[in-house]
From Swiss-Prot:
One of its GO terms (molecular function) is (R)-carnitine:4-(trimethylammonio)butanoate antiporter activity. The chain crosses the membrane at residues 10-30, 51-71, 92-112, 143-163, 195-215, 231-251, 263-283, 316-336, 347-367, 398-418, 446-466, 475-495. It holds the Pfam family BCCT. Belongs to the BCCT transporter (TC 2.A.15) family. CaiT subfamily. InterPro entries: BCCT_CS (IPR018093), BCCT_transptr (IPR000060), BCCT_transptr_CaiT (IPR023449). This is L-carnitine/gamma-butyrobetaine antiporter. One of its GO terms (cellular component) is plasma membrane. The gene is caiT. Pathway: Amine and polyamine metabolism; carnitine metabolism. Catalyzes the exchange of L-carnitine for gamma-butyrobetaine. GO terms for biological process: 4-(trimethylammonio)butanoate transport; carnitine metabolic process. It catalyses: 4-(trimethylamino)butanoate(in) + (R)-carnitine(out) = 4-(trimethylamino)butanoate(out) + (R)-carnitine(in). Homotrimer.
Amino acid sequence: MKNEKRKTGIEPKVFFPPLIIVGILCWLTVRDLDAANVVINAVFSYVTNVWGWAFEWYMVVMLFGWFWLVFGPYAKKRLGNEPPEFSTASWIFMMFASCTSAAVLFWGSIEIYYYISTPPFGLEPNSTGAKELGLAYSLFHWGPLPWATYSFLSVAFAYFFFVRKMEVIRPSSTLVPLVGEKHAKGLFGTIVDNFYLVALIFAMGTSLGLATPLVTECMQWLFGIPHTLQLDAIIITCWIILNAICVACGLQKGVRIASDVRSYLSFLMLGWVFIVSGASFIMNYFTDSVGMLLMYLPRMLFYTDPIAKGGFPQGWTVFYWAWWVIYAIQMSIFLARISRGRTVRELCFGMVLGLTASTWILWTVLGSNTLLLIDKNIINIPNLIEQYGVARAIIETWAALPLSTATIWGFFILCFIATVTLVNACSYTLAMSTCREVRDGEEPPLLVRIGWSILVGIIGIVLLALGGLKPIQTAIIAGGCPLFFVNIMVTLSFIKDAKQNWKD
């Protein structure tokens, strides 16, 4: 029994360092919020202005890697000897489900406002040119390019899972071909895993920080309960308790059902917005935006704005590339696990086509609706943000639709379910990554899962206390820096091992 407890207990070298680091950072932040905001602005400015180019080149190089996989020597290689575990339709639906988080609903509803009010390329704010480019930039940030980078890493993890039969719960496990078993299991591997975990904790905390205000603003709109930081903290606490109950009572099946409900409700809500907002305009705007994307793509790929220094690529493109980098390993592991039995080419094409369609539908429908409301002067987003915050502005874009009460109820349920599944996924991923020899299909210890969900909740509350989007953007960018190198090492390790062991 003692040996069994040791096996399923925490792994101290990857459990305590992230816990201590994140705990200290949260404590320092809460001690002096004003000083923390000064540091946040300095970190954001340094990383985006000094190293933003590196994130842009990373995405471009990974795009070339995608073409190499699709048309290169491994294109027809199968990821495992078994037939595909899921039908193509189910596989693509699962991909779509992974895109419908509350954070995605947050950005999809408000992102276009920022693009047209502070546009790139020296365009006049709120001008025709800015509006023509607004959705095109969303399609760029959430389109084929980032999904192509995920394709490469998904192939890498699927190769390690199903071809090499490796148990991978932390990125260091994949680095044996690159640095050797001694270093991968030694200090170097421990450092890599700690970088990954700290970054992942902050990423999940930021997602919670984006999702929670949407739920509390819905509560204010529906029930008249004032939106305060205390209410945010209460809601986050309720999610943590609900997650603990689900785990303790073996209700994981219920969580999976909730995830399916979230996906179907997402389709329903998007369909509703598409129909009542203006289907003809949405399709015309999308078509025009694809053309604008193709026209400006080379400039977008390499846009750093070093002369005019308007800040658009730093505030948005670099931020989003860091967002994609920081979630790459977690997301790619999930996508790899549902892709057993598929060929490399099939996985690459399926991800780029299926996931791009998912994100493009979300951003096109929600962004077009927001633009229509702005153009018709139905809502005043700048005033809403200044007086009440970004979350209220997002809620008003939904409340402006017909049958507003029913619409807000649907949005409220969607955000609530999305965040419940987010907290559950957060606690599971972090617990799996910080426990000793918990294999796929087994459950990590209950207290470890609850502990991590509490810490992620604390980070969400701290980011909300700081106020505004800049702390959230900075947390993502700071976390993305170390994972930038981790992702590259995983990629190189796959290439090296495949060259030696994946021959005809």
